[in-house]
């Protein structure tokens, strides 16, 4: 499943590191199984992360992204609350995970 890690505490306006990962096969639709049958396409296409009602980071994933994608990015801690991350599959299925932060 998805994981999101941020510092537990930060000062208002402090730049922090947000680290995320999701366990996912990231199948391109090009690989064949042991019987020679094409494995169906199934990959994360979009990632977003919001904090305090603002988009902090977004990314489009393409076929070159390996399984279990990991992202690390910088963001400003604006207020106490959560960093809300969403991964969207090419099927439309969404995975969400949040991490709490206390801002002083």
Model-derived regions: residue spans:
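Contiguous segments within soluble domain cores/interaction surfaces
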Residues: 2-61, 66
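Extracellular Ig-like/FN3 beta-sandwich strand-entry sites
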Residues: 15, 78-82
């Amino acid at each position: 499943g998805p994981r999101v890690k941020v510092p537990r505490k930060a000062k208002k306006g402090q730049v922090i590191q947000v680290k995320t990962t999701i366990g996912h096969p990231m199948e391109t639709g090009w690989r064949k199984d042991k019987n020679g049958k094409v494995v169906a396409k199934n990959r994360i296409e979009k990632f977003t992360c919001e904090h305090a009602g603002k988009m902090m980071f977004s990314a489009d994933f393409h076929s070159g992204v390996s399984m279990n994608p990991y992202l690390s990015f910088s963001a400003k801690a604006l207020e106490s609350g959560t960093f809300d991350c969403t991964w969207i599959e090419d099927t439309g299925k969404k995975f969400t995970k949040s991490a709490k932060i206390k801002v002083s």
